[in-house]
Amino acid sequence: LVVALGEHVYLRLQDKAPIGLGHCVIEPIEHVPSHVEAAEEVATEARNFQKCLVRMFAARGAQLVFLEQHLRLGSAGLPSRDTMAIECIPLPARDAAAAPGYFKKAILECDEEWSQHKKIYDTGGCVRGTVPAGFSYFAVSFALQAGYAHVVENEAEW
């Protein structure tokens, strides 16, 4: 179900196993591999949708967690996750304060001990400019104020 339509992106309800009430997804109208690789106008419009959602859920006493997972097309013979999709998940304010700690711990524990890239990057709330284009990654943002990214080196184990 499409909730809002912009010039470059749209907002829809999550129809495949939503995590909770209000779980929605921001996706581009035309194919874009990831938020990192999106044209400036697509990224700006997606960010504006995120800002509106943050304000809307804050008025209801909830905070948003934004997630994006980008796996390179055909890497390791796996099905692709090669289209930008920003998951928007509202959390009650009492739970949202603990979310950054849980995500940081999970990211730090998720990959091999010896990897080529840093295990975790502080994104400051936006993955663009943190992860280079063409890399597989997982990113999480907390109400656009803070966030983390992780470069996925082994997609088969991710």
Q: What are the language-model segments listed below?
A:
Residues 1-158:
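HIT superfamily nucleotide-processing domains
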